[in-house]
C-alpha cells in the first residue's frame, strides 16, 4: 500500500534534481525526504501545518516575537502583491526571516538540513459582495531570504494543485464521483489523470486553439484520432 510518504523517495531516485527547487505539501515533513532532496542538490520549500504542532508553533512564534521587537532577525525581507480578478481583490503579503541562529533555534538542523528561511504568507480576499477572508500559511525553506522569489514558488505550487483539481472536476466531474469502496477510487483517479494527459498532449500537438471540453467530446466520439500520440 503506497502513499505520498512512501512514493516520493522512490520518485526522487529517478529524477535529476541538482539546482532545482522542490515544493511539496505537508507530506514532506518526513525528514528522510528532505535529506534526500539536499543530497540530490535540490532546495526545498515545505508547508508547515497544524498537524506538525511543534514546528508550526515555533515558526509562528518567530514571526510574532520579531514583530513585537523581542529580537531582530539577521535577515528579513517582505513583499506584497495585489490582484483584481472578476470583481475580487486579493492581497498577499510574504514575510521571510532568516539567519543561522534563528533557523537553528526554530528547528533542529539535523531534522531540517540547510534550513535558511522561515516564510509567512498572509492572504486577504475581498469579493464584490462576500465577506472579507483572511488566511495565514507558514513554510520553511533551504532557499535564501528573498520574499518575492519565495512567494512565486509558493504560488506556483498551489497554481499547479488548483489547476489540476479544477480541470479534473470541470472536465471529468471528479467531485461527483460516488465510488468510495476498495480500490475503485484510486483506479478511477489514475484513469482520469491518464485521460487528461492524453487530451492535453493531443491539444498541444494538434489542436492548440480548441478547448479542452470540445476535444474531450470529440475524442469520446472518435477515439482513433489519438493514435498519433499513442504510437
Give the residues covered by each predicted segment.
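A short alpha/beta connector and helix-capping loop motif
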Residues: 31-49
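Solvent-exposed alpha-helices and their adjacent loops that cap or buttress functional pockets
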Residues: 13-16, 36-39, 111, 128-132
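Conserved, well-structured functional cores that handle cations and Mg-NTP chemistry
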Residues: 1-24, 29-32, 205, 209, ...
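Generic secondary-structure signature for well-ordered alpha-helical cores
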Residues: 13, 42, 64, 68, ...
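An anionic, glycine-rich sequence signature occurring as long contiguous blocks
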Residues: 49-156
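Short, conserved catalytic/metal-binding motifs centered on acidic residues
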Residues: 8, 21-29, 44, 139, ...
Amino acid at each position: 500500500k503506497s502513499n505520498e510518504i512512501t512514493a516520493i523517495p522512490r520518485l526522487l531516485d529517478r529524477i535529476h534534481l541538482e539546482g532545482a527547487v522542490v515544493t511539496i505539501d505537508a507530506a514532506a515533513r518526513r525528514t528522510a525526504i528532505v535529506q534526500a532532496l539536499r543530497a540530490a542538490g535540490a532546495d526545498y520549500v515545505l508547508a508547515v501545518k497544524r498537524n506538525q504542532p511543534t514546528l508550526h508553533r515555533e515558526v509562528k512564534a518567530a514571526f510574532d516575537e520579531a514583530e513585537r521587537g523581542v529580537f531582530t532577525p539577521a535577515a528579513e525581507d517582505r513583499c506584497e502583491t495585489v490582484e483584481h480578478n472578476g470583481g475580487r481583490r486579493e492581497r498577499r503579503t510574504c514575510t521571510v526571516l532568516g539567519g543561522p541562529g534563528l533557523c537553528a533555534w526554530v528547528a533542529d538542523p539535523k531534522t531540517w538540513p540547510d534550513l535558511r528561511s522561515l516564510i509567512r504568507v498572509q492572504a486577504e480576499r475581498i469579493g464584490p459582495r462576500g465577506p472579507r477572508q483572511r488566511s495565514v500559511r507558514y513554510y520553511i525553506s533551504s532557499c535564501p531570504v528573498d520574499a518575492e522569489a519565495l512567494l512565486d514558488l509558493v504560488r506556483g505550487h498551489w497554481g499547479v494543485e488548483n489547476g489540476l483539481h479544477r480541470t479534473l472536476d470541470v472536465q471529468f466531474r471528479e467531485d461527483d464521483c460516488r465510488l468510495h469502496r476498495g480500490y475503485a477510487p484510486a483506479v478511477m483517479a489514475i484513469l482520469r489523470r491518464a485521460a487528461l494527459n492524453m487530451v492535453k498532449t493531443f491539444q498541444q500537438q494538434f489542436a492548440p486553439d480548441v478547448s479542452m471540453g470540445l476535444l474531450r467530446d470529440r475524442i469520446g466520439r472518435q477515439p482513433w484520432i489519438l493514435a498519433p500520440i499513442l504510437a
